[in-house]
Design a protein with these regions (language model features):
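N-terminal helicase ATP-binding lobe
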Residues: 1-300
Length: 300
């Protein structure tokens, strides 16, 4: 199929540009870049609808990641100047949302690092950026006064952990989509993506993960500490450690995690939980690297 070849070629093109390969051969998708982008968005819509119906599957995840390889050409530094007619920030938001849905939350947050939320006129885009960045991208207006209902719903859930607010926001977005209450085609796509991200966020957030471990424990101070670090959910490796009983150990445990998998953060959680439950206990934390010990000293 022609579009399958275009997506494969777009991956090759991105690789060549990223590694400075000279004399990149002519590729058909680049000569038809407007049609290619329209196809990508149409394909995106189709996959998102399937995701809402069936949830994440291996096939959907693969299709989404292939799609991200095509979309990112229109935004990343090495390639975006070769394309035209696409809002770079909004396109980055599509790509970041895909990585978020596929559990690559660190990548999705990194892509949003230099984004100014004021670039997004649409409420759906702003809320997406806020959730995906862990609050790193936020409106300058801090109070609830005069804020839209959707912002209030999302923030109250994040700050207070009451699921009724997130459920209400999911209902608001579902109703908007059902009634086709959109200001533009971009609003249509962003609202669809937001519906998917909200469902993912409902399943994967700090409040839900921590309460599953100990529903009677007061997690509010730890969630507040995490928000200051722009963390709204655990990384997959961290969640896996929790699911395997990290906080329920009796005498000792061995924590094996890849580099940059969030060991320091998950250790903070362990220390917090132990000392809250056993304030008379003492903890010896050996930091093997000087940089890590300095980081711990700065944070605590």
């Amino acid at each position: 199929m022609k579009f399958d070849k275009w997506i494969n070629d777009s991956e090759k093109y991105e690789f060549c540009k990223s590694y400075g390969v000279a004399n990149i051969p002519s590729m058909e998708f680049k000569e038809h870049q407007e049609n290619f982008y329209i196809y990508l968005l149409s394909y995106f819509h189709e996959i998102m609808e399937t995701y809402l119906e069936k949830g994440m599957t291996d096939d959907i995840k693969k299709e989404l990641l292939d799609l991200a390889d095509g979309l990112i050409l229109y935004s990343q530094n090495e390639t975006y100047e070769d394309f035209y007619g696409v809002n770079r920030g909004q396109n980055f938001l599509y790509v970041s949302s895909i990585y978020y849905l596929c559990d690559y939350t660190a990548i999705s947050s990194l892509l949003m690092h230099d984004i100014d939320i004021e670039e997004f006129p649409l409420e759906a885009s702003q809320i997406l950026a806020f959730i995906i960045s862990g609050g790193g991208v936020e409106k300058r207006q801090k109070s609830y006064d005069n804020e839209e209902v959707s912002w209030i719903n999302v923030k109250k859930f994040i700050y207070q952990g009451e699921e009724i607010y997130l459920d209400e926001e999911i209902s608001v977005q579902d109703r908007k989509y059902k009634e086709r209450d959109f200001d533009s085609s971009t609003d249509f796509y962003m609202s669809l993506v937001l519906r998917c991200v909200l469902r993912k966020f409902k399943e994967n957030n700090l409040w839900t993960s921590l309460r599953a471990i100990d529903p009677d424990f007061d997690w509010s101070s730890y969630v507040r500490h995490s928000r200051r670090q722009h963390i709204f959910s655990f990384l997959p490796s961290q969640q896996d450690a929790l699911n395997k009983g990290l906080l329920n150990f009796q005498r000792a445990f061995s924590l094996k995690m890849p580099t940059s998998a969030g060991k320091s953060y998950i250790t903070e959680l362990l220390i917090h939980y132990v000392l809250k439950n056993h304030p008379e206990d003492r903890i010896l934390y050996l930091a093997p690297l000087r940089a890590l010990s300095r980081e711990l000293k700065d944070h605590h």
